[in-house]
Curated annotation (Swiss-Prot):
Microtubule inner protein (MIP) part of the dynein-decorated doublet microtubules (DMTs) in cilia axoneme, which is required for motile cilia beating. GO terms for biological process: flagellated sperm motility. Residues 53-143, 186-307, 348-409, 460-488 form a coiled coil. Keywords: Cell projection, Cilium, Coiled coil, Cytoplasm, Cytoskeleton, Flagellum. Expressed in airway epithelial cells. Residues 216-238 are annotated as: Disordered. Microtubule inner protein component of sperm flagellar doublet microtubules. This is Cilia- and flagella- associated protein 210. Pfam families: TPH.
Length: 552
């Protein structure tokens, strides 16, 4: 068998054919060179042998689409590579349509760049010219705005007054030298002086009313700012109280949720314990039923044993009767043997043999029947016990699976609760962080607003100081220019240069734009000193002042 298995053909022949004698000799080398293609314990009669050409045809048929697709991809790749090489070769040619088009585009691009450069130069020159115009306009506007300020206007009024006074004194001197006792001229001059004094007084009162109105407006604005600050503080306090209330409500809600979760957990635990208790009760009932079934089985087996014992006793009785009958027949036959002839002895022996064979047959059938019944009972008992064991095992598996499912559900429930708690803690932390950030942001905004207000005040003070310096420089130049001609009429200019309404000599009010009151004060608080006038002046200088045209 081993020799025939070694001589089996592997390719191109049916199972059972042998190779040539020259190939059979090298069986060991074949085993080394050609490893077995079939698994062990395979019936070679059930194996289909395919010729090499057919196998190759099948492989070609299966791989045809792949080869065709590979060929198509290779052709497309070769065409694409050739196209790219062609494009690379003719890329810099100038005698092609594409080359000429490229040259035209480059020339057009160059012309556009030159035109754009010229336009940029023109735009730059235009921008420089416009910037100069804007700068000049801004300087003119600043100068006009400077001339339109109240102090400059007052200074110009004082300048005009000094020039008027200078001109008036010149005219007075001229008239005095020409007509010294012209009462009509004096009356007219007096009227003019009174009229001028009234006009100046009205202007001064008007300026004073305007300044009072401006001061009231400033006080009103200060009061509005203070009220706005009070409202803002109240709003912030209200926001803080609202945040505290929201936090308290959130904590109450979280406590309620925790209480609800605890109640749900207690309820779930109670249901689980009830379920386990019911399960134990069911298990006890099932165990009781199992015990009842086992008791029934034991009773059945006991009854079956009793029946078997009764059958054995009956069989023993039957055997005893048969032995007794056999003995009786034997005695009867022995008596007949004494009486009959030899042929009769043969007939009797044959009958005895037949009777014994029949009895043995009946006994054998009976034994087989008893054995079959016992075997059936044993098989039934084994099946019942096996079913019971399988049911018990299945019940234990189901109980274990149910317990695992309950434990898994409990674990999932706790994980879910833990996740919900983490999520709630995270939300609470986020809300708390948001509140903290909002409070910090409000503080930062308030601090920024205060800093901005301080910066604004500093910038305002710096601007006021710069404007004051500019005004003082301008006034000094004008006063020096006017003092070159005469020093007699520069007092209105000096008075207009002084700070405060009316050129007061009181303390400087920084919060009121550097105003100086016209009354005497004790300190920088600006409290006016009491005024005591025990007696009036002995001589009234107002008449002389009005006659001379003074307005202060």
């Amino acid at each position: 068998m081993d020799t025939s298995s070694e001589m089996l053909v592997r390719f191109g022949r049916r199972c059972g054919r042998a190779k040539e004698s020259t190939e059979i000799r090298n069986s060991e080398e074949d085993q080394v060179l050609y490893l077995p293609l079939l698994p062990s314990k395979v019936d070679l009669q059930q194996v289909t042998i395919i010729p090499h050409d057919e196998w190759k045809r099948i492989q070609d048929s299966l791989d045809r689409l792949t080869r065709e697709a590979a060929c198509l991809r290779a052709e497309r790749k070769a065409k694409k590579e050739m196209h790219l090489r062609s494009q690379e070769v003719v890329k810099h040619w100038t005698n092609t349509y594409a080359g000429m088009k490229e040259q035209k585009l480059e020339a057009k691009k160059k012309r556009d760049e030159e035109i754009e450069a010229e336009r940029q130069i023109l735009d730059l020159e235009e921008e420089i010219y416009k910037q100069g115009k804007r700068k000049k306009a801004i300087e003119n506007a600043k100068q006009y705005q400077f001339y339109q300020t109240e102090r400059v206007k007052n200074f110009h009024s004082g300048l005009l007054l000094s020039r008027v006074m200078k001109e008036r004194d010149a005219q007075i001197e001229f008239r005095k030298s020409k007509i010294k006792s012209d009462k009509k001229w004096e009356e007219q001059l007096k009227l003019n002086i009174e009229k001028a004094f009234k006009e100046e007084q009205e202007k001064a009162e008007k300026r004073h009313r305007e300044r009072v109105a401006l001061a009231k407006d400033h006080l009103k604005q200060i009061k509005e700012h203070e009220e706005e600050e009070e409202r803002r503080k109240k709003y912030e306090e209200k926001d803080a109280e609202e945040i505290k209330r929201q936090n308290a409500l959130y904590e109450i809600e979280m406590r309620k949720k925790l209480e609800k979760k605890r109640e749900e957990m207690h309820e779930s635990r109670r249901r689980f314990l009830e379920h386990m208790q019911d399960k134990h009760i069911i298990k006890a009932v099932e165990q009781q039923q199992q015990e009842e079934e086992d008791e029934k089985m034991r009773k059945f087996i006991k009854a079956k044993k009793r029946l078997i014992q009764m059958g054995k006793e009956k069989e023993a009785e039957t055997h005893r009767l048969m032995e007794k009958r056999r003995e009786r027949i034997h005695n009867f036959l022995s008596e007949l043997l004494k009486e009959k002839l030899d042929n009769e002895d043969m007939i009797i022996a044959r009958d005895i043999a037949e009777a014994e064979a029949e009895w043995e047959k009946r006994e054998r059938e009976k034994d087989e029947k008893n054995k079959a019944e016992l075997k059936t009972i044993a098989e039934y008992r084994a099946i019942v016990m096996k079913n019971k064991e399988e049911e018990e095992r299945q019940r234990k598996i189901e109980a274990k699976e149910q317990l695992l499912a309950v434990m898994k559900a409990d674990q999932i429930f706790w994980e879910h609760e833990k996740e919900k708690k983490c999520k709630a803690d995270k939300e609470h932390q986020e809300v708390q962080d948001a509140h903290i950030q909002q409070m910090a942001k409000n503080k930062f905004n308030a601090k920024q607003a205060k800093q901005a207000e301080l910066d604004y005040c500093r910038l305002t003070e710096a601007l006021v100081a710069e404007k004051e310096k500019e005004f003082q420089d301008y006034a000094r130049e004008v006063i020096e220019l006017e003092s070159e001609t005469t020093n007699k009429y520069i007092y209105p200019l000096v008075k207009a240069v002084q700070e405060g309404p009316g050129g007061g000599r009181g303390p400087v009010f920084v919060d009121r734009g550097g105003l100086r009151p016209s009354y005497q004060a004790n300190d920088v608080t600006g409290v006016q000193l009491p005024f005591y006038n025990s007696q009036g002046p002995k001589y009234n200088f107002q008449k002389s002042k009005r006659r001379l045209g003074f307005t202060w």
